[in-house]
């Protein structure tokens, strides 16, 4: 991921196609916002070329640029990895989604667990939600995650944080690991110790996030409010990232 943006710019200049220009501009804009510690106003546009788009662009630029087009498409598809390595974030929060969470779920206070560098916490705070960010900070020893938080992070394991900060309206967990059972332990702690009416997870069903057991349980809520929130949070890449709410009466 070294010189990621530089490689993008070079390939963009060589390919010289408006569809490619647009995606490179989108990536640069996201990088500008995140790099300056600011949340995006709305979810980013879709990145990467679908097979038919790839073929259409290739016809216009010539087959001699196929290698370059393949390379830049690979960079588009690896943008999330770039963000994780440079800024320690896997999920791109945005103000529109945060405002909908506040309004539709009637949230005034929130606790983010496994917060990493707390980009989601920062965004929730931006729309007026009093937010506490917590993380065990174990991975901060070996990665960028947590190295430069966007919001103050308290060193606390998830279940301990839920027990300590029990009087919040919302618990949020973004990109819980797809190994171990920390997500199940967090839900168990919520049931035992917390007064929070809402618990949401951000991730990919049966994919990049959460334990297999998490997805096998029949505890997901399906509400009009959640549908509206998710309509503002379409994924920007091939990962089907969405917001899931756990039923507190399962």
Where are these regions (language model features)?
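Conserved SAM-binding loop of SAM-dependent methyltransferases across substrates and taxa
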Residues: 117-129
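N-terminal accessory regions of S-adenosyl-L-methionine
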Residues: 1-92, 237-239
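Conserved class I S-adenosyl-L-methionine
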Residues: 106-116
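Conserved acidic residues
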Residues: 108, 169-170, 197
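C-terminal substrate-binding/active-site "lid" region of AdoMet-derived donor-dependent transferases
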Residues: 181-250
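A short SAM/SAH-binding and catalytic strip from SAM-dependent methyltransferases
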Residues: 168-183
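S-adenosyl-L-methionine
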Residues: 134-170
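Conserved alpha-helix/loop element of class I SAM-dependent methyltransferases that forms part
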Residues: 84-107
């Amino acid at each position: 991921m070294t010189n990621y943006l530089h490689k993008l710019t070079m390939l963009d200049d060589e390919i010289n196609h408006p569809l490619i220009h647009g995606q490179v501009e989108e990536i640069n804009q996201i990088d500008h916002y995140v790099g300056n510690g600011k949340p995006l106003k709305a979810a980013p546009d879709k990145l990467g070329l679908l097979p038919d788009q790839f073929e259409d662009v290739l016809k216009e630029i010539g087959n001699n640029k196929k290698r370059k087009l393949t390379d830049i498409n690979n960079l588009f598809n690896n943008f999330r990895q770039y963000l994780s390595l440079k800024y320690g974030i896997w999920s791109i929060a945005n103000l529109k989604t945060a405002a909908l969470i506040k309004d539709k779920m009637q949230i005034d206070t929130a606790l983010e667990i496994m917060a990493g560098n707390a980009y989601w916490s920062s965004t929730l705070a931006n729309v007026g939600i009093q937010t506490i960010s917590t993380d065990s900070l174990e991975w901060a020893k070996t990665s960028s995650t947590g190295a430069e938080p966007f919001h103050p992070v308290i060193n606390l394991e998830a279940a301990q944080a839920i027990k300590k900060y029990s009087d919040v309206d919302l618990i949020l967990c973004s990109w819980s690991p797809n190994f171990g059972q920390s997500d199940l332990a967090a839900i168990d702690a919520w049931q035992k110790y917390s007064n929070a009416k809402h618990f949401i997870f951000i991730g990919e069903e049966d994919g990049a996030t959460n334990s297999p057991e998490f997805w096998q349980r029949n505890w997901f809520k399906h509400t009009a409010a959640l549908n509206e929130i998710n309509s503002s949070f379409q994924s920007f890449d091939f990962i089907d990232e969405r917001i899931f709410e756990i039923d507190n009466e399962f």
